[in-house]
UniProtKB/Swiss-Prot annotation:
NCBIfam families: prmA. Its EC number is 2.1.1.-. It comes from Staphylococcus haemolyticus (strain JCSC1435). S-adenosyl-L-methionine binds at T160, G181, D203, N246. Methylates ribosomal protein L11. Gene3D superfamilies: Vaccinia Virus protein VP39. Keywords: Cytoplasm, Methyltransferase, S-adenosyl-L-methionine, Transferase. It comes from the Bacteria. It is found in: Cytoplasm. This is Ribosomal protein L11 methyltransferase. It catalyses: L-lysyl-[protein] + 3 S-adenosyl-L-methionine = N(6),N(6),N(6)-trimethyl-L-lysyl-[protein] + 3 S-adenosyl-L-homocysteine + 3 H(+).
Length: 312
């Protein structure tokens, strides 16, 4: 199977919206190449510099590379994406550019690894590719070894970083955690590293469940985390202290009431994957259901919300 790489250059202001469009239309991964990275490329903390090549980055704005199964990427899908992006309110037509190419499966399986290096995702957590060697800076640093596979994120997206920071703040070792839409399993692994004993990782995609299980094994926690296919929380009967969901906003909106019902009293709902334009809508529904909003964090057009269940 081959992949169609759809490359879209846009102004920075609309990057989260375009990412959301691509994910909604079924992209199997999005690579972000930001022109600002050429200006702000410090020596990294691992003792070497990953030098960025100017020719790999747009002159202005952000290049988003989205990957679609070639057999599913037809004229209809192409036109829907172009129309949705072109019609965005704050799109800069002087920056906007579309291009595409076909990438063979064997090339893509390794190509995405060029973008993935060890990085500090939060105060405590460092994400380390499974194929790289890394030495911790100090004993307090917690390393998550990750091989996300081509269809899942590497943990460097703002939504993941904000979720990890929320986990550091709100998750205790005596809590129970359910991770909805686990993907690569990174948030479940983080919970395990904090000492959580009961963790359940759900994903509607069986491929995601398998990738998560492989990453659990890499982090020596495969026996500590239950990873199963599941359709959000619709059939969940067990109660948990923490519900985590880093997924798309419209899916989060549909599961807010189920999240509330799944939580024990005083439990927390940690959720991200929400673009700025939709966060008030999500906030309002969470409050209407009964959540006490504990924090709302913003990062590069994305939002992470934490709500607490304060009564049964």
């Amino acid at each position: 199977m081959n992949w169609t790489e759809l490359s879209i250059v846009v102004n920075h202001e609309v990057e989260p919206l375009v990412t959301d469009i691509l994910e909604n239309y079924g992209s199997n991964g999005v690579v972000i190449e930001d022109s600002n990275d050429l200006i702000n490329q410090p020596a990294d903390k691992f003792g070497e510099i990953y030098e960025l090549k100017q020719e790999d980055y747009p002159e202005k704005g952000v290049r988003l590379k989205a990957y679609f199964n070639e057999l599913k990427f037809d004229d209809s899908l192409r036109n829907k994406i172009k129309t949705a992006v072109t019609n965005l309110e704050n799109i800069d037509s002087t920056v906007l550019n579309f291009s595409e190419q076909t990438i063979a499966e064997v090339d893509w399986e390794n190509e995405w690894k060029n973008y993935f290096h060890p990085f500090r995702a939060s105060e405590k957590f460092t994400i380390v590719p499974s194929w790289e060697q890394y030495t911790k800076e100090d004993d307090s640093e917690m390393c998550i070894e990750l091989d996300p596979g081509m269809a899942f994120g590497t943990g460097d997206h703002p939504t993941t970083s904000m979720c990890l920071k929320a986990i550091e703040t709100y998750v205790d070792s005596d809590n129970s955690v359910i991770d909805v839409g686990t993907g690569s399993g990174i948030l479940s692994i983080a919970s395990h590293l904090l000492g959580v004993k009961r963790i359940k990782a759900l994903d509607i995609d069986e491929l995601a469940v398998n990738v998560a299980k492989e990453n659990f094994a890499k982090n020596h926690c495969e026996d500590a985390i239950e990873a199963v296919p599941g359709n959000l929380l619709k059939n969940e009967t067990e109660k948990f202290d923490i519900v985590i969901a880093n997924i798309l906003a419209h899916i989060i909106e549909d599961m807010i009431e189920d999240a509330y019902n799944t939580l024990n009293k005083d439990g927390y709902f940690i959720t991200s994957g929400i673009i700025e334009e939709k966060h008030k809508q999500i906030l309002n529904k969470m409050q209407n259901v009964g959540f006490d909003i504990k924090s709302v964090n913003h990062d590069n057009g994305w939002v992470c919300i934490v709500g607490q269940k304060v009564s049964e």
